[in-house]
Amino acid sequence: MNKKSKFKFTAKLGLILSIVFTLLCAISANLLLSNFGKVKIETTTVQTRSGDNVSIRVYSPKVATSENKAPAVVLAHGLSTTKECYAQYALELSRRGFVVVTPDMLNHGGSDITPFETFFTDINADAYGIYAAVNYVSKLDYVDLDQIGIVGHSMGGNATNMSVNLDNMSGNPVISAVYLIASNPTFKDFEGNWANVYGNRNVGLYYTYYDHVYFSTQTEDGQPVSAQQFLDSNEAKSFVSFGQDPSTLTDVEVIPGHTYTAEINGKQVIRRITKADEIHPKPQGGNGSVAAVVDFFQESFVAPNYEVGAMQIWNFYSLASILGLFGALSICVFTIATLTKTKFFSSLKAEANKQLKPAPNKTGKICFWVLTIANCAFAFLSISFIFEKGYGYFTTEFLPQQTTNIYALWSLANGVFMLITSFGSYYLYARKQGDTLKSWGVLISIKDFLKSLLLALIGVLSVISVLYIAQYVFQIDLRFYLWGMREMPLDHLYLFFTYLPFFLVFGIAVSISINSAYYSKIGKEPTFINDLFFALMNMIPAFAITFIGYYLFAKTGFQPDIFGAPFTFTYMINAIPVFPVAVLLLRRLAKYCNNPYIPGIIVGSLLCFMQVASVFTCHTFMFMG
């Protein structure tokens, strides 16, 4: 009688399945982004008048030809994001027949990193490179020159307004419609007089009610007016009145969603404000703003394939994209699992069926809870200190990324503190129970440490390779909303190595903490509950600061000066899911390794790469508070 063979899930099988899964996700995302092959997507560069290169992505419906010209839209991203972060707008517009161009601003993403003077003051920088993309579009023979629009979110709105000014000065303006997302319109001319700087262009505004950056104004006596009162402001009244001086207006009511019309230079022109009960970054991943943008340009131009803006498929693209990222992380885990079974890396292999240690005794539990709460409390205190002292707002020649400086300093501070608490628990409790630094995996031979470095490097490269393939083969990054990973231009890689030490300290420290010091049950919980507990504990500081900050902001209309500074809470939203995912990845990697360095180096490196690849870079000493 033949015995039935049991199916055995191996590391090699896991690696193969992870590769196949990630590939399927990338293919699915690309198919959705290209409207199943009906839209040609290509990435190229254009030059500003200052001679700097701007990376742009061009979405061209294949039905657009020199005989069948299509309307076009240029989309400007916000500060410290990239063109990939707004792919949903390009997807929805291009599948409706619009040519769409999404540039990386100068000093962002794949574009050149320019000096301070070029980025901020040089008119030849072409509005951070955005107007260079407009000029590029105007030269495409399959674009209708009478139907070119521009849209920008946040700082991209600033770039949009600057592009309009440049267009006005060009002598041959090509922009005929403008949309601003969570960004102020231009209300006055260069002399400070109320004016219609947009001329006979259609202009729409997506007004985010809980916006902490834009829409706040002042009364005539200089008193601040919150963004939540924007619709009652003189600025809003002037906008819907096509630049008229508010003092000359009587009984003007700004009604969100209402279309205001006027005839300017023989053309019927519209102004519209769409009110959204959203926070400032929501349009980076929200359906409402996408619908508003699509409907606005379909109304302003002749839409080749009209479909109401609320009909959207980009969420499926976003799902495929983020699943692709999890697939890439799975490739990393199973790469490590597979290689530790080889002869060369066998000395780094974890013991068979590695399990969490039993729960500690009463003394151990007291030690665990005190130190765990201390780690959590220190995260609150350290980020407050960083912002209170102004360290959250600076750049230097050597540390040129303001946003990264926040997370780098926070990672370093928390990493050092976790090392103190982890080794504190060792000397106070663990060694009295028979633990040693060798049993923790902290004390290893130099040979094994060097092998660990090599294995960790392979793990990091397995993920980064996926990012480059995703970018250059499938024209996507791997993300959901604010959170994701993309490749870096090779000439920008020095930024990764500049910030790597900060994140390595954090990654290794957290790994020692949860994979050595606290690699045990708390009670009788299953392993996955234990993993989720540590993931939750690492998420609490960022989540609490974000929630409290936005709650108070929603109540008062003004940024609360808590946790060190008024803007602290606005930066913490980016960290909310990142830390728990990092913890879960550390735990998964630890199942196959006998020391905490391999998971720590991998996670620290990936956190660093994720952070530095997308944000604003400027090599100068500057305070951005």
Regions found by a protein language model. Name each.
Residues 311-325:
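Juxtamembrane/start-of-transmembrane alpha-helix segments at the extracytoplasmic/lumenal side
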Residues 1-11, 355-363:
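Short, Lys/Arg-rich N-terminal segment immediately upstream of the first membrane anchor
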Residues 326-373:
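Juxtamembrane interface at the cytosolic side of transmembrane helices
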Residues 38-313:
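Soluble extramembrane regions of membrane proteins in the secretory/endomembrane system
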Residues 27-31, 333-343, 469, 548, ...:
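Structural signature of transmembrane alpha-helix termini at the membrane-water interface
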Residues 2, 369-625:
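Alpha-helical transmembrane segments of integral membrane proteins
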Residues 6-47, 55-57:
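An N-terminal hydrophobic leader/cap segment in hydrolases
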Residues 11-21, 324-328, 371-374, 413-417:
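Hydrophobic H-region at the start of alpha-helical membrane spans
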